[in-house]
A protein has these predicted regions:
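Conserved loop-to-helix interface motifs that mediate assembly, gating, or partner/ligand docking
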Residues: 2-167
């Protein structure tokens, strides 16, 4: 049977853990609120962009470019987003589960024909562990996304598609 001192230490430990958990909950709540505000501020731009694109696409119905042509899939690329931390394990687990389900559809191509752009440390670690080809290290984008690096990734993917390296 534990002594009185051990019981008091255990109670103090549980209380300390409760305080830490409460602080983490407040930080997560603050980050969630900030993300919600950012999304709400972006919605008017998204609807205007959608309107512009629909108008453009309706007026150019016969427009053809290299990205609209259909071709046999021999090489495939995935852009996969995850977090850099473990504080959202369900999110990361679901992302990785979906990635693995999607890759399953293309296993007949072989690992050498699957290229993954891992954005976030958790997915980058999983890609490396499973032995798939990674297009680079984009872990910093998960914490601090920026337009310049996103454009670089889009250009890389576009160039690889045009050059026939991915389908």
């Amino acid at each position: 049977m534990p002594s009185l001192k051990e019981i008091k230490n255990r109670i103090a430990s549980v209380n300390s853990t409760r305080k830490i958990t409460s602080a983490m909950k407040m930080v997560a709540s603050s980050k969630l609120h900030h993300a919600q505000v950012m999304i709400e501020n972006m919605l008017p731009y998204e609807s205007m962009l959608e309107h512009i694109l629909k108008t453009f696409l309706a007026s150019e119905a016969d427009a053809q470019n290299v990205f609209t042509e259909e071709r046999e899939v021999k090489n495939i690329a995935f852009v996969v987003y995850s977090s850099n931390s473990s504080l959202c394990g369900g999110f990361n687990a679901n992302i990785i589960k979906l990635l693995l389900q999607t890759i399953e559809e293309y296993t007949h191509l072989g690992k050498d024909h699957i290229l993954i752009y891992p954005i976030g440390r958790k997915v980058a670690e999983k890609v490396e562990k499973l032995g798939y080809r990674s297009a680079g290290d984009f872990t910093n984008l998960a914490d601090k996304p920026n337009v310049a690096e996103c454009i670089d990734i889009a250009r890389q993917i576009g160039k690889k598609f045009i050059d026939g390296e991915i389908d």
